Structures are given as C-alpha cells and as structure tokens.
Amino acid sequence: MKLNVLRTDLAEAVNNVSRAVSSKSTIPALEGILLKAYGAKLSISGYDLEIGITTNIDATIQEQGEIVISARLFSEIVRKLPEEVVCIETDERMITYITSGQADYQIVGMSSVEYPDLPTFEETDSLEIKGEFLRDMIRSTVYAVSDNNSKPIYTGSLFDLSDKTLKIVAIDGYRMAIRKEEVDNESNTQFIVPGKTQQEILKLIDDEENVVISVGQRHILFKIEEYSVISRLLEGTFLDYKSTIPKDKKTEAVVNTRSLISAVDRMSLLNGDKIQSPVRCVFSGDEIRFSCTSTIGKANDKISAPVMGEDVEIGFNNRYFLDALKNVDTDEVKISLNGSLSPMIITPVKGDSFVALVVPMRLSNV
C-alpha cells in the first residue's frame, strides 16, 4: 500500500473513528484501526464488536492495499506531523512507513485478515431525518439512559416510530425523558439503540445534513455525511412508557426555566458525591420554596411562580432535577404534580414535544 493524503483530513477521520476502537481487547487487531486504500479513497475503520465507525477520505493512491495499525499510536503520530502532506506506505513485513516533511516513522502493523468483519445485515426499515432534529432529540433524552448493566435494556433508548412521528424514550428507574418530532415516514417500528452509540452519533452529526438510518433485526446503521456508524441493537422488552405518565394533576405551575435551574443549583451546593439529601420543594400560592438540609448545613431559597391547584411539599434528587431542566429548550416549563409521592412531570407550556419525569425522594415529615 502506498498513498498520499492531507494531514488535516487524516487527523479528523482518525480522531472520529478511534472512538469505536477497543482500549483493551483479547483480539489485538481491535485495538487498531483498519486502513484500506482503493481507487481514490482511503477507508478508515474502528470497531469494538459493539459499535463500528467507518469513513472515506480523498487520497492519491499509488498502490492499493490494507493494514491494521495501533489506533492510539497512529492518532498521536498524525496529530503531531509537521507538514500537510502525509505519505503512508507498507511493505510485505507489515511495516508501515509514515512520512511528513522531515519526520518519518516505521510502525509495526498487522494483517487486515486479523481484523473482524464489521456486521452486514438485511434492512427491514429505514428513516431519513434532519441532523439538527436527531441531534436535539438525542441530546435531550440520553441523560436519562441507565448506566446500570443489571438491566441492559435500559442502557439504551427506545426509538418508537409510528403515525409519522419519531419518539426517543430513555429511562433509568429514577427519571424518564421523551422527545418527539414529526417525520416523513409511514413505518411503524420500534428498536433500542445503546446510549454509547447515541453519544458517538452526537459527535458526528452536522445540523445541515440529513441522517439516514437503516434498521435490521439486530443491527442499525447511521449514515452521517462521509461516516457510517453501525451498532448492535439491544434486545428485550422495553417498559410501556405511556402507562408510567400520571394522568391526574393536582398541582401545576408555570416556571421560568433559568430561574428554576438557578434555584435548584443553589440548593445543590449542600450535596456532593458522598452527601445526597433531597431538595425540598413547596409549591404554594405564588411561589416555590426550596430548602436542603445535609450534614454540612442548611440552605433556603424561593422563586415567584403562580401555583394552580393544591399546595404540595415534595423532595427530589438535585442532580436528576437539574438534568431534566438543563435539557429543556424552552424559556418556560410547566411543572405538574399529583401529590408528594408521584413523579413530577416537566413539559412545554404549549405542545408536547418533550416530557420529562423525575421520581421524588421521600421526605422525613411527609
């Protein structure tokens, strides 16, 4: 293999692809990236048996070929090369020669035969969505994905496509986030995408470009400009999320989002990694009163907000409360409550583009 490529193109591609590379694997080749030189393109792939990222960049190919090279080392070398033009060449001993300006490296590579094939699958459904919409949907829900592997199904989000509407639902047992957008698609299907995959998708999405999603029985493919991201799907039965949203609402308040975040954030100063006391919220009259008592002290605050319905005193985990509020994209939110032991519902003042639920914490005197 012998080729010339631009360092800026190579560095960006290697940086993005390397995120799918195993940091430690029983298969040594998976700690590397796969380079394939054919036609006028250099293909670059990373894969950890769960998620694979592949891209193609322009290159001047003198000799076609393939090689696997350490992702960590190759990334560092490319990032620090002195000139814009990079020459990459391999020999029959799997030695890779990297040259740029006066700098040159000789790196031991591996045969591409040792690199596992990325999955292929038969497409059962497909969807095209604007990158901006998908980015906002993932960003406003992925925070609620579980990191507890005892229930693997909830380490991903449910993508629920029906009635020309796509909903993304994430739940971890303490909070739930739902975001929906209308799409030009008649399919009715559901699939569960790992949270890790969604995080990688976020880093690649361009707001102006459409993302093409191809779904199979066990895998999903996201086509994002020059990048292809293939991931396994999570298998199992996801919670009937619609039934978990309380129907009754005894108390409602419309609140300025930024003011609410600031108040809860101030209460959070009394909590930390080893201290977790509930933020006590009293909805009454024309205000919401906040307090927090922990082993290091006490704090009190209040904000103005018209409260409709019954007065209620309720406690929440400060981090869960803040996560929900910080992923809202409206200036005001509606808070709905059904007593002190039922989940809090956060929605837009108008419409239903998002729903966030936060399960309360028991208060000692409630």
Stretches with model-predicted labels:
Residues 1-366:
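Structural preference for solvent-exposed beta-strand-turn elements
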